[in-house]
Amino acid sequence: MQPLRQSFRTDQSLQWTRVHDLPDFVYFNHSIHIHKGVGCTTCHGQVDRMPLMWQESSLQMEWCVDCHRNPERYVRPRDQVFSVDYTPPANQLEVGRRLVDEYQIQKLTSCSTCHR
């Protein structure tokens, strides 16, 4: 916390280390993922339990494509998107299929979905 206090007292910006750094040619929009029911912890992990932030998931194309091909495995109710305590139900695939339909999630795997 000392660097934060020092920054506040001196009005000097903190020096940040980027943890999640996608290649420049990858387009990623947080808002569409949130709107479609992808929870923060799905990609970022249990950040509330990380003493220092680290990259939980590879964020490599194969990892992203798995979710795009099988969103029913990962979506959750919109009111649970920001919950760090959310646990998928035992019948996640059933619930996920319903949410995919309700949220009108398309299984977008075209290159141009992410590469622009």
List PLM regions with ranges.
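Membrane-embedded segments
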Residues: 1-15, 21, 46
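Short, solvent-exposed interaction modules
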Residues: 16-26, 30-31
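Sequence context surrounding c-type heme c attachment/ligation sites in exported
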Residues: 29-116
